[in-house]
Protein backbone atom coordinates (compact mmCIF):
# COMPACT_ATOMS: atom_id res chain seq x y z
CA UNK A 1 0.00 0.00 0.00
CA UNK A 2 1.48 3.38 -0.96
CA UNK A 3 1.06 6.48 1.15
CA UNK A 4 1.22 10.15 0.35
CA UNK A 5 4.16 11.96 1.95
CA UNK A 6 3.15 13.13 5.41
CA UNK A 7 0.40 10.51 5.61
CA UNK A 8 2.44 7.50 6.64
CA UNK A 9 0.96 4.95 9.00
CA UNK A 10 2.64 5.44 12.36
CA UNK A 11 3.06 2.65 14.90
CA UNK A 12 3.40 5.08 17.79
CA UNK A 13 2.94 8.81 17.74
CA UNK A 14 3.03 11.77 20.07
CA UNK A 15 1.38 14.95 18.87
CA UNK A 16 0.59 18.36 20.29
CA UNK A 17 -2.64 20.05 19.26
CA UNK A 18 -2.86 23.80 19.87
CA UNK A 19 -6.39 25.20 19.81
CA UNK A 20 -6.96 28.96 19.61
CA UNK A 21 -10.03 31.16 19.14
CA UNK A 22 -10.44 32.32 15.55
CA UNK A 23 -9.26 35.93 15.07
CA UNK A 24 -12.84 37.02 14.37
CA UNK A 25 -14.16 35.55 17.65
CA UNK A 26 -14.23 37.57 20.87
CA UNK A 27 -11.88 36.18 23.50
CA UNK A 28 -13.08 37.38 26.93
CA UNK A 29 -10.45 35.32 28.75
CA UNK A 30 -7.72 36.91 26.62
CA UNK A 31 -9.15 40.39 27.25
CA UNK A 32 -9.29 39.74 31.01
CA UNK A 33 -5.69 38.50 30.96
CA UNK A 34 -4.55 41.61 29.06
CA UNK A 35 -6.35 43.81 31.60
CA UNK A 36 -4.73 41.95 34.52
CA UNK A 37 -1.32 42.41 32.90
CA UNK A 38 -1.94 46.17 32.81
CA UNK A 39 -2.72 46.08 36.54
CA UNK A 40 0.68 44.43 37.02
CA UNK A 41 2.33 47.43 35.39
CA UNK A 42 2.57 46.09 31.84
CA UNK A 43 0.89 49.12 30.26
CA UNK A 44 2.05 48.34 26.73
CA UNK A 45 0.29 44.99 26.59
CA UNK A 46 -1.08 44.28 23.14
CA UNK A 47 -3.73 41.78 22.21
CA UNK A 48 -3.78 38.59 24.29
CA UNK A 49 -5.44 35.40 23.07
CA UNK A 50 -5.98 32.40 25.35
CA UNK A 51 -6.17 28.88 23.96
CA UNK A 52 -5.23 25.37 24.98
CA UNK A 53 -2.56 22.82 24.21
CA UNK A 54 -3.36 19.10 24.20
CA UNK A 55 -0.70 16.39 24.13
CA UNK A 56 -1.78 13.08 22.57
CA UNK A 57 0.08 9.78 22.61
CA UNK A 58 -1.33 7.03 20.41
CA UNK A 59 -0.11 3.54 19.69
CA UNK A 60 -1.24 1.22 16.94
CA UNK A 61 -2.07 2.24 13.40
CA UNK A 62 -2.33 6.00 13.81
CA UNK A 63 -1.83 8.30 10.85
CA UNK A 64 -1.75 12.04 10.31
CA UNK A 65 -5.25 12.07 8.80
CA UNK A 66 -6.65 10.40 11.94
CA UNK A 67 -4.87 12.94 14.15
CA UNK A 68 -6.38 15.80 12.14
CA UNK A 69 -9.81 14.19 12.49
CA UNK A 70 -9.37 13.97 16.29
CA UNK A 71 -8.19 17.59 16.48
CA UNK A 72 -10.95 18.92 14.23
CA UNK A 73 -13.91 16.85 15.48
CA UNK A 74 -13.09 16.21 19.13
CA UNK A 75 -10.61 18.74 20.49
CA UNK A 76 -11.74 21.93 18.76
CA UNK A 77 -14.93 23.65 17.69
CA UNK A 78 -14.31 24.50 14.01
CA UNK A 79 -16.96 27.23 14.10
CA UNK A 80 -15.05 29.37 16.62
CA UNK A 81 -11.58 27.79 16.92
CA UNK A 82 -8.58 26.98 14.76
CA UNK A 83 -6.16 24.19 15.56
CA UNK A 84 -2.54 23.44 14.74
CA UNK A 85 -1.18 19.89 14.80
CA UNK A 86 2.48 19.20 15.55
CA UNK A 87 3.76 15.63 15.43
CA UNK A 88 6.52 15.29 18.00
CA UNK A 89 7.52 11.64 17.45
Which functions belong to the PLM regions below?
Residues 1-89:
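Non-catalytic terminal accessory/regulatory regions of metabolic enzymes
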Amino acid sequence: MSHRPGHEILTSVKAIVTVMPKPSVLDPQGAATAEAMKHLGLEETGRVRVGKSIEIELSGDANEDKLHEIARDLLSNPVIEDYRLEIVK
